[in-house]
C-alpha cells in the first residue's frame, strides 16, 4: 500500500463543518482528500477518481449512504474500494445493514475523534 501522501480519501458528508474537520485531519497526516456533500456527488467522485478509501455518511441528501454503498459495491470499477460508514445512526439494524451491504467498518461519529477515524483508515489500508 502507498504511503499516506499517495492515499486518496473521499469523504462523503453533508455537514460542512464536520467534513472540514475530517479533511484537515487527514491532510495533516499527509493524505490527499476530497469532499462530496451529497450521495450523488460522492458516487460520481468515486466512479471518476477511484479513491483508496471512502468515508461515507448515511443520512445524505439526494441519495442516502446505503444506496451509494450498494451502487459502489455493484460497480466493476468501485466494488473493491473499502468503505467505512461514518454516521450518527447507531441502531443495530443500521450497523448490520451497512456491514451486510459491504462496508468494512461502521463508526458512530459521536464515539470517535477525528484522529481515531484516521487511525481506522490507516488500519484498513495497512498503513498503521
Per-segment meaning from a language model:
Residues 13:
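Conserved acidic carboxylate
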Residues 19, 61, 70, 79, ...:
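The feature encodes the CheY-like receiver
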Residues 32, 58-59, 73, 84-85:
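The short loop immediately C-terminal to the conserved phospho-acceptor aspartate in CheY-like receiver
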Residues 49-55, 60:
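Active-site beta3 strand of CheY-like receiver
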